[in-house]
Amino acid sequence: MRLSRYFLPILKENPKEAEIVSHRLMLRSGMIRQQSAGIYSWLPIGLKVLNKVCTIIREEQNRAGANEILMPTIQSADLWRESGRYDAYGKEMLRIQDRQKREMLFGPTNEEMVTDIFRSYVRSYKDLPLNLYHIQWKFRDEVRPRFGVMRSREFLMKDAYSFDLDYEGAKMAYYRMFVSYLRTFARVGLQAIPMRADTGPIGGDLSHEFIILAETGESQVYCDRAYLDLAVPGADTDFRNDAQLTDIVTRWTTPYAATDEMHDEADWAKVKPESQVSARGIEVGHIFHFGTKYSEPMGAKVQGPDGKEHLVSMGSYGIGPSRLVAAAIEASHDDAGIIWPKTIAPFGAGIVNMKPGDEGCDGVSEKLYEALTNAGVDPLLDDKDERPGAKFATMDLIGLPTQVIVGPRGVAAGEVEVKDRKTGERQSLGIKAAINMLTAQA
C-alpha cells in the first residue's frame, strides 16, 4: 500500500478524552474514531490489525476442534425468557421491538441462541463432543464506557460453546479451550496468565480469567513469577490427547495466580517472597464451565449409551478481539507510539522515501516495494512529500516492526537504513541484502 493513497488520519495532539495509552494511541494513529459514547468506527489501519487478531483466533479455535458458525446480533426475547435471563439481565441489555411489536434484543451474549441451535439438531451422544464458536459484534449498555475499545458498549467477541454428555467430557472440552487460549495469546504477542475465577453458584474449579500484566490494568493481580518462564504449548500439541492436555493444564494452574477478588493471603504467603508478583492486570479472555444451567431450562438433551436422555454439560469461552487489540498496545508501546508484534502488525514493514521525486530514491523505493510485496511482506510505502521528521514520527506512531529508510546519501552508496522499531537498532545494508533480510522474515 502507498501512503499517498491510504486513508490514515493521524492526530498530532493527544486527545483530551483518552485516559489510557491504548485509547490515546489508537485515536492518534488513525485506528478508530468515536461515533458516540462507547461506540467506534474502525478505520483501515485499525481494521487490518483487528482482522489479523481474528485470523489467529480462528486458526487456534479450528486447531482445537471447534466449528465456526455465525449467529445474528438481534435475538428473540422469547429465548431469553425460556432460560430465565430476560428479566434478570438488567439495563445493560438493549431491548427493542420490531414493527410487529415483537420483543427483541441486541445480543450481549449467545448462550440461549447456541443452545437453541444445538437442541434443534443434535439427538445422540454419538454426535458429541461438539464445540461451536462465532465472532460477532455485541452490545452492552455500560453505565460508564471508558478507556476506548477496552470498555466500550459495542465490541467484537469470539464466543465458543461446548456440549458434552457429562462432566468428564465437559472438563476435557474446557482443557482444550484452556490450551487453545494459551496458544492464541502467545501468537498475538501477549504473555497471558490463567487465573482462577469465581464459578458462582455452580461451584467447582473450572473457571479461569486470562490476564496480561500492564500498568494500566483495571484489576490488581497476584501470581508466582514461575508463570513468566512457562513454555507455551507448541503447534504440535495434540488436542485429541487427553493426557497431554491434562498435563499442560496442570502445569499452568499449579503455581499461585489470582485476581484481587479470588486472592487468598494464606496461599499467597506460601509463595517465596522473591517469586511474588503483585501487579495490575487486564483480562483478555475468560473460560467457564456452567454445566446444565442452560440445557436444563431449554431442554437440550441427547440420548446416552444407556438409552436414556441426558442433559448436556456445557461451557463457554470468550475472547474479545477488539479489546485484545487495545491490550496488545498497553503491553507494547513507548513514548513515540505503538510497537506491534509482527503477527498482528498492520503492515510487515514501512518503506520511507525521504525524497519523493528524486529519481534514485524513487527507483530504490519502488524496487523494495515490489520485492517485499511479491514476498508477502505487505509493506507500506511512505511516498508523501513531507519533511523527514514527520515521516519518522508517523512510522514510529503506527508501530510497524521494521522501517526501511531510503535517502539520497544512502542510495548514492547503494545502501538503505533498516530500523527495528522495538529495539531502535539501525543498520545500513546493501539494497539486495535488505531485501533478503526482510523477505526471509515473511
UniProtKB/Swiss-Prot annotation:
One of its GO terms (biological process) is prolyl-tRNA aminoacylation. GO terms for cellular component: cytosol. Gene3D superfamilies: Anticodon-binding domain (3.40.50.800), Bira Bifunctional Protein, Domain 2 (3.30.930.10). Its main location: cytoplasm. Its EC number is 6.1.1.15. GO terms for molecular function: ATP binding; proline-tRNA ligase activity. InterPro entries: aa-tRNA-synt_IIb, aa-tRNA-synth_II, aa-tRNA-synth_II/BPL/LPL, Anticodon-bd, Anticodon-bd_dom_sf, Pro-tRNA-ligase_IIa, Pro-tRNA-synth_IIa_bac-type, Pro-tRNA_synthetase. Pfam families: HGTP_anticodon, tRNA-synt_2b. NCBIfam families: PRK12325.1 (NF008979), proS_fam_II (TIGR00409). Catalyzes the attachment of proline to tRNA(Pro) in a two-step reaction: proline is first activated by ATP to form Pro-AMP and then transferred to the acceptor end of tRNA(Pro). PANTHER family: MITOCHONDRIAL RIBOSOME PROTEIN L39/PROLYL-TRNA LIGASE FAMILY MEMBER, PROLINE--TRNA LIGASE. Belongs to the class-II aminoacyl-tRNA synthetase family. ProS type 2 subfamily. This is Proline--tRNA ligase. It comes from Brucella abortus (strain 2308).
